[in-house]
Curated annotation (Swiss-Prot):
Residues 431-518 are cytoplasmic. Residues 138-153, 482-499 have a biased composition (Pro residues). Residues 20-409 are extracellular. This is Golgi-associated olfactory signaling regulator. The gene is GFY. Residues 38-377, 477-518 are annotated as: Disordered. PANTHER family: GOLGI-ASSOCIATED OLFACTORY SIGNALING REGULATOR (PTHR47641:SF1), PERIAXIN-LIKE (PTHR47641).
Length: 518
């Protein structure tokens, strides 16, 4: 459905856009070139493609975000596809305002452009495949003018990447990336190339895995990638040229194809397909595997050589390639893409060749900086050690205190115990002493209650010790002393006189008592 609608859009737009194709291509060159034209020193078309890609990829530049990207892809297509591809792409891209929502307009314009590009690229698929393979190399310098090589990388990409991407990359990239977000287009455009360029450009700047780039990128360039990417990347008709193509190519169908493939093709030609999609790559590869490989190898070499010429494309490409792989990287590298636009080729190329290394170096620098703090922290650690020593001393003191407390407790315990024992011994001694002083206190006499003195009245046998034998020594005077003799009776009264008269008894009454009676 989407493919047919895209074809219809292509047909409709081709009618009106072919007339606009030439102006729109220059506009991308003008708009995208200010930023990217210089970067693509090799060929203005490459710069334009890259610039338009960046613009398209970088909605940051609202003026040329998507219309330019569309136009730039057309420009790239112009080289690859003289008017048809450029016209459909430019009008479509213009009409399909990438800035607005690259999704439908871009998809349509891209669809139209893609359909045309598919038709024309299909016609030139072998060309595009070879140019695409050689994206930056020699193979299709005129057709594939990429950042890698003026015409070969880009146009070839426009054809191969674009034809397949125009359907899928442009539509998919314009739609998918626009769908994703202008930032993703920008960031993906720049970051796909940069993010993946750091990975693939730096990692594979020379590497570009030629075989892979032919395989994957060629596959991506071929129509199969378009269908696959349209299906795989986006439901959009020709949006899934690459999962990454959608991200990388969407940001810059031409630039991703061109820039990405010049840089990432020769650098990461395989990486773009890799990043984009194994399936897409596989499908694309069957279509033009060998030519792409050959061209990819050549383009890889060319792209490596024209890195100065294709710095912008390379950088945008490197930022864009990682888009689907690392959207975060895309966003992070969007500024780089913008920077490359403004600074044009030199920063991107330097970034392409160096960015990964530069990130690595900064990371190393950061570790160095961290190391310095670590050294400081080491010094702090020494201080901490001192503190620990102090703590240890305090701990020793504290430990001693607890031990002293324990010793004191033990001393108190023993002291208390000794005191109690002493008290008990003293009491016992006092008791014994008191017992000695009162020897009979505990003895009972045989008579129970009779005092011993009472029994002394009756004389007893001195040798009768039964009753008197005391347990202890008894003083002799007590035992032998006899009670004093009773006093003699008083003398009796003389008998009454016999011969006289009897004594008269007087009543003792008050009357009879004398007056002086008391």
């Amino acid at each position: 459905m989407k493919s047919f609608s895209r074809i219809l859009f292509l047909v409709f737009l081709l009618a009106g856009l072919r007339s606009k194709a030439a102006p729109s291509a220059p506009l991308p060159l003008g708009c995208g070139f200010p930023d990217m034209a210089h970067p693509s020193e090799t060929s203005p078309l490459k710069g334009a493609s890259e610039n338009s890609k960046r613009d398209r990829l970088n909605p940051e530049f609202p003026g040329t975000p998507y219309p330019e990207p569309s136009k730039l892809p057309h420009t790239v297509s112009l080289e690859t596809f003289p008017l048809d591809f450029t016209e459909p792409l430019n009008p479509d891209l213009r009409e399909t305002p990438h800035p607005e929502s690259p999704e439908t307009p871009k998809a349509d314009s891209l669809t139209t452009s893609i359909s045309e590009s598919l038709d024309m690229p299909k016609t030139n698929l072998s060309k595009m495949a070879h140019p695409e393979s050689s994206e930056t190399p020699t193979p299709g310098p005129t057709e594939m003018p990429h950042p890698g090589s003026p015409e070969t990388p880009k146009p070839n990409f426009s054809k191969t990447s674009r034809p397949e991407f125009p359907e899928t990359p442009n539509t998919d990239l314009m739609q998918t990336t626009p769908q994703e977000s202008p930032e993703i287009l920008q960031l993906n455009a720049t970051e796909v190339s940069q993010a993946e360029l750091p990975e693939t450009s730096n990692t594979n700047p020379t590497k570009t895995p030629d075989p892979k780039s032919p395989e994957k990128h060629d596959l991506n360039s071929t129509e199969t990638p378009n269908s696959e990417f349209l299906q795989a990347l986006h439901p959009d008709p020709s949006k899934t040229p690459h999962p990454e193509s959608h991200v990388t190519h969407n940001p810059s169908p031409t630039e991703i194809s061109q820039t990405e493939f010049p840089t990432t093709y020769y650098q990461n030609a395989t990486d773009v397909p890799r990043t984009s999609d194994p399936q897409i790559s596989t499908s694309l590869y069957p279509e033009t595997p060998v030519p792409f490989k050959d061209d990819a190898t050549a383009l890889n070499e060319l792209s490596l050589n024209p890195k100065p010429g294709t710095p912008a494309a390379i950088q945008p490409d490197s930022p864009k390639l990682p888009t689907s792989d690392s959207p975060g990287m895309v966003e992070l590298k969007a500024p780089q893409n913008s920077g490359p636009k403004e600074s044009n080729v030199p920063p991107p190329s330097a970034r392409i060749a160096g960015p990964p290394a530069l990130p690595g170096r900064p990371s190393q620098l950061a570790p160095a900086t961290l190391r310095a703090p670590q050294r400081h922290s080491r010094g702090e650690g020494v201080n901490t050690i001192i503190v620990v020593e102090r703590v240890k001393e305090t701990g020793v003191t504290l430990v001693g205190r607890p031990r002293g407390a324990a010793g004191g407790a033990l001393c108190l315990f023993f002291a208390g115990t000794a005191l109690l024992i002493g008290i008990f011994v003293l009491l016992w001694c006092l008791y014994r002493r008191a017992a000695r002083q009162r020897p009979f206190a505990h003895h009972r006499l045989p008579d129970d209650g009779d005092e011993p003195v009472l029994h002394l009245d009756a004389p007893k046998d001195p040798y009768d010790l039964y009753f008197y034998a005391p347990d202890t020594w008894v003083p002799s005077h007590i035992a032998t002393k006899q009670p004093p003799p009773t006093p003699p009776l008083p003398p009796k009264l003389p008998p009454p006189p016999r011969g006289g008269r009897p004594q008269r008894l007087e009543a003792l009454s008050p009357a009879t008592l004398p007056n002086n009676f008391v």
